[in-house]
C-alpha cells in the first residue's frame, strides 16, 4: 500500500508468501465525498516471481505487461468496476438488487478524438512552460492555433479522470509542480 505524498511501499499481508499482490490507491478524490461527488480507487494485481521468499519492494515494482489484472472502481450515483486482464477493457455496474456486478460495457476503447482536457487550474503558476503553452492554446478555442473549442474538466481525481478519458477521450494532466 502506498499513501499519497509518501513514495515508500507499505506491505500489509496475512500471508507474507502469497502468490499474488494487490496494489491499490484507495479513495482517490476522497475530498469529493464531502460534496456528494464520485470518488474512486485504482488497483493492480501482480504475480510474485518467487513465492518462497519474503515479499520485497521489487515484487511490487513490475512493468505493466507483467500485471495480471488492473482496473478502477468508482463510487457515486452508481458503483462501477472497470477491469482489464490484458485483453481489452470491460465495464461492470453493481446491480444493488442482487448484489452482483453486471457487464454493461464490453470492449471499452478510448475515442480517437476529443475536445476535453483536465488539469488543476489553481496550480497554473507552477506549470512547466510547455504545459502552460498547451493549455493556453486550448483555451483560445477555435480562434487559437488548435482551431477548435476545448472543454476543461477538473475534479481532483485521477481515477475519475481516467474513467472520463476511457468513455469520452481527452487528456488528464498532473504536471510536476515542485
Where does each model-flagged region fall?
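IMPase-like, lithium-sensitive Mg2+-dependent phosphomonoesterase catalytic core
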Residues: 1-178
Amino acid at each position: 500500500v502506498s499513501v499519497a505524498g509518501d513514495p515508500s511501499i507499505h506491505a500489509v499481508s496475512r500471508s507474507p508468501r502469497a502468490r499474488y499482490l494487490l496494489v491499490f490507491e484507495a479513495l482517490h478524490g476522497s475530498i469529493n465525498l464531502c460534496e456528494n461527488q464520485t470518488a474512486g480507487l485504482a488497483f493492480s494485481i501482480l504475480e510474485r516471481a518467487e513465492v518462497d521468499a519474503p515479499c520485497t519492494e521489487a515484487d511490487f515494482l513490475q512493468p505493466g505487461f507483467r500485471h495480471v489484472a488492473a482496473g478502477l472502481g468508482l463510487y457515486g450515483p452508481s458503483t462501477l468496476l472497470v477491469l482489464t486482464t490484458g485483453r481489452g477493457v470491460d465495464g461492470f455496474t453493481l446491480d444493488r438488487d442482487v448484489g452482483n456486478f453486471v457487464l454493461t460495457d464490453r470492449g471499452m476503447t478510448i475515442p480517437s478524438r476529443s475536445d476535453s482536457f483536465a488539469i488543476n487550474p489553481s496550480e497554473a503558476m507552477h506549470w512547466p512552460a510547455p504545459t502552460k503553452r498547451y493549455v493556453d492554446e486550448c483555451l483560445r478555442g477555435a480562434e487559437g492555433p488548435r482551431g477548435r473549442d476545448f472543454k476543461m474538466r477538473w475534479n481532483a481525481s485521477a481515477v475519475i479522470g481516467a474513467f472520463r478519458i476511457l468513455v469520452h477521450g481527452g487528456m488528464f494532466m498532473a504536471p510536476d509542480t515542485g
